[in-house]
Amino acid sequence: MRTLIERYYSQYYFIDTTITDPNLTEDQYVNQHTNELAVIGVAPSHPVLQQEISKIEFKENAINNEVSGVRKTGGFKLQSNTILCVITCSNGKEYFLRSCIKGKLLEINKELINNPSLLKTNHATSGFLAIVEPMIKDKFMENPGLIKFEEYHKLRNIPIQKGPVFLKDNTNDED
């Protein structure tokens, strides 16, 4: 365990199986926290990270979503293909980002509306799209389209980079 994400999250990636062109990689990440909530964002292979983003528009039902109480009542119900937002690039290309999993929308990152460049500069951390309470918690991998961190990096031919190793993190199961 090295970075906060590596330490407290199980990392998964949503691969859009409807796209048949292997050069199109509009993948997204789904990081499940130890408290079972999921953080949705843009994977490093997504083409939007290579372009100039002009605006990010969240769907009206996502912006007006309000949850309250310990049980987070009132959250908007999501299907895995529910569109959370539309990203428009300076060249006119639009990307539709989905929720990736079934669940209840708890929060969207409204900071992206005013500062769309945050998605490019910090896509893995403060540039997240949404926080979702998954419907399937115990068997998270049963969400269709999700693959594990290692599988994703192997599939997309991306080298795995880990954070620094600290003495207190050294265990027999990590190399």
From Swiss-Prot:
GO terms for cellular component: nucleus. Belongs to the ABITRAM family. May regulate actin polymerization. This is Protein Abitram.
